[in-house]
Amino acid sequence: MEKYILSIDQGTTSSRAILFNKEGEIKGVSQREFKQHFPHPGWVEHDANEIWTSVLSVMAELLNENNINANQIEGIGITNQRETTVVWDKNTGRPIYHAIVWQSRQTQDICTNLKEQGYEETFREKTGLLLDPYFAGTKVKWILDHVEGAREKAENGDLLFGTIDSWLVWKLSGRTAHITDYTNASRTLMFNIYDLKWDDELLELLNIPKQMLPEVKESSEIYGKTIDYHFFGQEVPIAGIAGDQQAALFGQACFDRGDVKNTYGTGGFMLMNTGEEAVKSESGLLTTIAYGLDGKVNYALEGSIFVSGSAIQWLRDGLRMINSAPQTENYASRVESTEGVYMVPAFVGLGTPYWDSEARGAIFGLSRGTEKEHFIRATLESLCYQTRDVMEAMSKDSGIEVQNLRVDGGAVKNNFIMQFQADIVNSSVERPEIQETTALGAAYLAGLAVGFWDDKEDIRERWKLQTEFKPEMDEDQRHKLYSGWKKAVKATQVFKLED
């Protein structure tokens, strides 16, 4: 009877369950979307109970549709949308408020207030993060401040906090395991990434009682077992956890110092493994934990691109220039160049290394000869220029020149983007055979803990290259194109409309 690892990939818009065999191949996928809540402009929330039921349903569907018995599952790995925050009553098991999603800006005032009091550097020094609504700490404070009776309950030890991984493990284990892993803890603004402990000073600044917080564990160990009635009569070890971007890094077998992966999703996320050294960034990158394994912690530098694949969605849904995303490859390839057109997709500001929340999208270099093909090509190229921006910041901070870039996410299917990416960063771009690297990373972490795979070398050997894109552009052309991009970004930042 063949054995498997089941990976739960709990994302921002859907929950998925994916089955992996010993070879790291996908044997089945089930997916369910859930509702997004937008109570006020800039706020994004989820119903944590709906997330839980969506996870239960995709697991059941996955096993049923693939005729798999629960006793064929050796372990469960969990990867999750990071930073999204749940606070629940440990006695009733019910959340006291919606989950506040990583995208939500409702805690901006808390962040501004802490900055005005001069605490930004304190948070940065201990957590490697910016004082921004993106991260979990201010979300917890907001819930305690705004839900009647919550603060008193928290101080009495009746409330629990967790990122989505914690919430799912607590539910799957029958309320016995209140834990998280290093990668998720490192995204909370409450965890000291050097001491590897919840930080008392930061908790005091946020006014969050320590007893609410989960125990922090490695990314690969047995945290507990499923209770039989949640998993079809079986007690299966829950054995691997990582936030989505760190899971993708692990799934890409980026185990060595200097290994880099870039995910082209709605936004873009680049992570560089910096080994056992936490590199402090001077270039607008985040310092975070890559994974905790075998008693050691590996750190990472992370860069965020706010608009990546969503720029292609905009061509389709906003401008109606295309009917489907794959068409962009054909259009972009019909012309030799953009003829000097640059598109800066700063629809929600600019991320790394600019961190300019007020910048807005812009198009430069239009002429009477500009056609749809030039416009589409400029949009695709913008993904690659932004990636170079982040890569240069990483090389500067780490002192490591990136030799090759491993890629995943929806846009990697586009050969034009991949080739232009290789050209503009002047390094090879490696597209793997299995592109579900986030779920695969969580599966690998769980599989290592239960002995399904032997060690990192065993995993490294299973990473398979589908296509390698090598740079073909000469240095003069590369320099000219990238210089034009930098001018376009600068002009975008200068243009500001008054309220």
UniProtKB/Swiss-Prot annotation:
Annotated positions binding ATP: T12, T13, S14, T266, G309, Q313, G410
Task: Give the reactions, separated by semicolons, that this protein catalyses.
Answer: glycerol + ATP = sn-glycerol 3-phosphate + ADP + H(+)
Q: What InterPro entries has UniProt attached to this entry?
A: ATPase_NBD, Carb_kinase_FGGY, Carb_kinase_FGGY_CS, FGGY_C, FGGY_N, Glycerol_kin
Q: What is its EC number?
A: 2.7.1.30
Q: Which PROSITE patterns match?
A: FGGY_KINASES_2
Cellular component, GO, one term: cytosol
Keywords per UniProt = ATP-binding, Glycerol metabolism, Kinase, Nucleotide-binding, Phosphoprotein, Transferase
Pathway-wise, it operates in: Polyol metabolism; glycerol degradation via glycerol kinase pathway; sn-glycerol 3-phosphate from glycerol: step 1/1
- Which Pfam family, an example, fits this chain? FGGY_N
Specify whether Coiled coil is a keyword of the entry: no
Q: Name one GO biological process term.
A: glycerol catabolic process
Annotated binding of sn-glycerol 3-phosphate, by residue: T12, R82, E83, Y134, D244
Q: Kindly list the positions annotated as binding glycerol.
A: R82, E83, Y134, D244, Q245
The entry's ADP-binding residues are T12, R16, T266, G309, G410, N414
What one GO molecular function would you report for this record?
glycerol kinase activity
Q: How is it modified after translation?
A: The phosphoenolpyruvate-dependent sugar phosphotransferase system (PTS), including enzyme I, and histidine-containing protein (HPr) are required for the phosphorylation, which leads to the activation of the enzyme.
> What function is annotated for this protein?
Key enzyme in the regulation of glycerol uptake and metabolism. Catalyzes the phosphorylation of glycerol to yield sn-glycerol 3-phosphate.
Oligomeric state and interaction partners are given as: Homotetramer and homodimer (in equilibrium).
The protein, known as: Glycerol kinase
Q: Which organism is it from?
A: Staphylococcus epidermidis (strain ATCC 35984 / DSM 28319 / BCRC 17069 / CCUG 31568 / BM 3577 / RP62A)
